[in-house]
């Protein structure tokens, strides 16, 4: 098996080739992600079934204008759109409190969905700004980026006001939590049920803080099955050598 088998088990290689048909680039994506992140077989199967290849790095952001080049590329890569929250088990009507509680009741799966390096800091995290108490929905620290990540969850459609609130929290974290020499600039991520892409892009352009906007989905979704011949071990190895 050569290059593939030397870093991941044959069973996982076969799983990728069985599930990802006629798309060498997609197969290589899952190979690289499995090796780099040490995914278990169940995690690999989950990310294939929820089509991570098509979702990763797809959030609308202003990172290229607000972060150093090296950090902006990695920050973008760590985003998803949409985020798959089917693991919450929520069906029917719900409110933001129910969704946030369901995310934290499944914190391990939530962290896996957020991506590499995310560590949970707190829910309704209190920030005293001047004489006012403010509460961040969810606060994380990303070890890969060495920065705090403010996550706001909205069950409705994106609104301009959401960016103003998120940007304010990001600035506050930089003043109150960030340590010079240890932490990179704080990033904000808004995860909403629906967004108008043009409106979201305009809102991002209006902010000087590094922010991203993504949607979430509560339903299980699977990649469209592609008919054709699956890539062979030799084809994958050849592509790896080319890269």
What is each of the regions a protein language model found here?
Residues 91-122:
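Acidic-basic catalytic patches of nuclease active cores, encompassing PD-(D/E)XK
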Residues 202-243:
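Polybasic (Lys/Arg-rich)
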Residues 116-144:
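Active-site metal-binding core of divalent-cation-utilizing nuclease and nuclease-like domains
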Residues 103, 136-140, 147-155, 168-171, ...:
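Conserved catalytic cores of phosphodiester-cleaving nucleases, focusing on short active-site segments
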């Amino acid at each position: 098996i050569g290059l593939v088998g030397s870093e991941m088990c044959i069973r996982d290689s076969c799983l990728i080739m069985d599930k990802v048909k006629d798309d060498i680039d997609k197969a290589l994506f899952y190979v690289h992600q499995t090796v780099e992140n040490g995914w278990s077989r169940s995690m690999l199967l989950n990310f294939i079934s929820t089509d991570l290849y098509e979702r990763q790095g797809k959030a609308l952001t202003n990172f290229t204008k607000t972060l150093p080049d090296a950090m902006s590329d990695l920050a973008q890569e760590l985003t998803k759109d949409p985020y798959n929250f089917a693991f919450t088990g929520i069906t029917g009507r719900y409110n933001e409190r129910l969704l946030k509680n369901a995310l934290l009741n499944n914190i391990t799966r939530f962290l896996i969905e957020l991506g590499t390096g995310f560590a949970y800091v707190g829910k309704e995290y209190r920030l005293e700004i001047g004489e006012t108490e403010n509460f961040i929905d969810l606060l994380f620290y990303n070890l890969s980026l060495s920065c705090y990540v403010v996550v706001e969850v909205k069950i409705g459609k994106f609104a301009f006001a959401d960016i103003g609130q998120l940007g304010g929290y990001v600035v506050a974290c930089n003043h109150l939590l960030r340590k010079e020499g240890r932490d990179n600039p704080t990033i904000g991520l808004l995860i909403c049920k629906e967004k108008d892409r043009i409106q979201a892009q305009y809102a991002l352009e209006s902010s000087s803080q590094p922010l991203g906007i993504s949607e979430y989905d509560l339903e299980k979704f699977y990649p469209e099955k592609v008919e054709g011949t699956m890539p062979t071990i030799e084809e994958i190895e050849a592509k790896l050598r080319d890269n």
